[in-house]
């Protein structure tokens, strides 16, 4: 009897020692968002996985996950959440999500929660802490897990009734040049006439040789496009900006890009805003069109801060150096300062293309004029 008691005591001590030093080994943590690029207030799902890859039974675990401070839970009202606020740094403001569960040997625990984010910006899923007791419940152990998952919220879509009107003449002139006036500088080949080509493209010499109607294939050296340039500097000789005006500019940039997409007009994008993440401090996207191109621009706008990486005059100088035939400019800025007028004039003079400047005040003025006409 004493032998069995000693044996049981030895097993108990061994299990306790093992649980203290090895009990929470081979546990993995991961959190994944169902979407990485979102609309403001769009619901998405964060799925958490805890993997347990050993024979040991874990009867009680508590998980504390650190999520972005502005995370909202529209449906799950029974989850345990506490929010940490700090006036020192926004990064110290967190939403802490608590969960308790147990894990059988070689078992994975999954937990999904529907959430949303209300404002434009870059948010991170960063870390979690897992607490578990030892075999006898005498002391607690903990594992800390680090991850780096980004969630980007695009600028808010704002309806600008006068946007088509303001851009109408600008885009109309480009469309006329693009679709009505070809610039065939080099003939690269010939193809059979299908009936859809204009009569002026028929090559009578090649048609006589081949015994059938042949049309010329051109290398069009002019590719008309629009460069959308977003400035966030609103105070001269300062990198700081007014947040509200800059946020309006980001939404306005989105509206401009949507109009260009609807018109099937190729466009590029650049901004002097500082952007968070791996993209870099100065961001630009080459000309293109389509969903992939559009969402690439939206990602940059979502990452952007209301702080400029360079003065607007330097941004305009870079634009002057990138001038090419057929390139037009839509400049979006919180306001137009007199110190920038010389650079804007230089950009206009350095190209035969058109330059249009849009500010939030442009739409406020247009709206007030419409109200006066209605009265």
Indicate where each model-derived feature is located.
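Short beta-strand-loop
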Residues: 271-300
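Short, contiguous acidic/charged loop-to-helix segments that flank catalytic cores in large enzymes
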Residues: 240-245, 284-289, 302-307
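Generic detection of short hydrophobic beta-strand segments and adjacent strand-loop junctions
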Residues: 98-101, 151, 285-287, 296, ...
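Von Willebrand factor type A / integrin I
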Residues: 1-22, 26-27, 45-47, 70, ...
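Alpha-helical structural motif
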Residues: 59, 186, 200, 290-297, ...
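Generic alpha-helical structural element
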Residues: 179, 193, 242, 286, ...
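Short, conserved, surface-exposed binding loops centered on an aromatic residue
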Residues: 218-220, 259-261, 288-292, 320-322
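An amphipathic, basic-hydrophobic helix/alpha-beta surface used to engage anionic
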Residues: 11-277
């Amino acid at each position: 009897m004493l032998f069995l008691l000693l044996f049981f005591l030895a097993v108990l001590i061994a299990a306790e020692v093992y649980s203290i030093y090895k009990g929470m080994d081979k546990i993995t943590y991961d959190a994944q968002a169902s979407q990485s690029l979102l609309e403001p207030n769009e619901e998405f799902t964060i799925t958490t996985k805890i993997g347990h890859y050993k024979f040991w039974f874990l009867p009680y675990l508590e998980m504390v996950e650190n999520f972005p401070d502005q995370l909202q839970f529209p449906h799950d009202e029974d989850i345990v959440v506490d929010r940490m606020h700090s006036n020192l740094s926004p990064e110290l403001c967190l939403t802490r999500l608590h969960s308790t569960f147990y894990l059988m040997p070689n078992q994975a625990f999954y937990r999904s929660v529907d959430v949303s984010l209300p404002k434009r910006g870059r948010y991170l899923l960063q870390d979690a802490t897992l607490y578990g007791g030892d075999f006898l419940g005498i002391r607690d152990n903990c594992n800390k897990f680090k991850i780096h998952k980004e969630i980007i919220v695009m600028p808010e879509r704002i309806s600008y009734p006068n946007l088509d009107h303001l851009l109408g003449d600008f885009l109309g002139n480009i469309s006329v040049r693009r679709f009505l006036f070809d610039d065939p500088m080099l003939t690269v080949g010939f193809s059979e006439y299908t009936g859809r080509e204009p009569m002026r493209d028929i090559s009578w010499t090649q048609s006589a040789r081949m015994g059938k109607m042949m049309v010329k294939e051109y290398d069009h050296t002019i590719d008309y496009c629009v460069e959308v340039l977003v400035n966030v500097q609103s105070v001269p000789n300062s990198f700081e900006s007014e947040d509200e005006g800059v946020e309006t500019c980001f939404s306005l940039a989105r509206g401009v890009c949507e109009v260009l997409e609807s018109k099937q007009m190729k466009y590029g994008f650049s901004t002097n805003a500082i952007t968070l993440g791996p993209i870099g401090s100065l961001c630009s996207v080459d000309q293109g069109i389509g969903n992939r191109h559009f969402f690439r621009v939206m990602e940059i706008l979502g990452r952007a801060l209301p702080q400029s990486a360079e003065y607007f005059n330097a941004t305009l100088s870079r634009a002057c150096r990138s001038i090419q035939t057929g390139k037009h400019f839509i400049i979006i800025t919180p306001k137009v300062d007199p110190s920038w007028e010389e650079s804007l004039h230089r950009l206009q003079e350095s190209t035969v293309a058109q330059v249009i400047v849009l500010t939030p005040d442009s739409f406020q003025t247009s709206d007030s004029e419409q109200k006066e006409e209605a009265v």
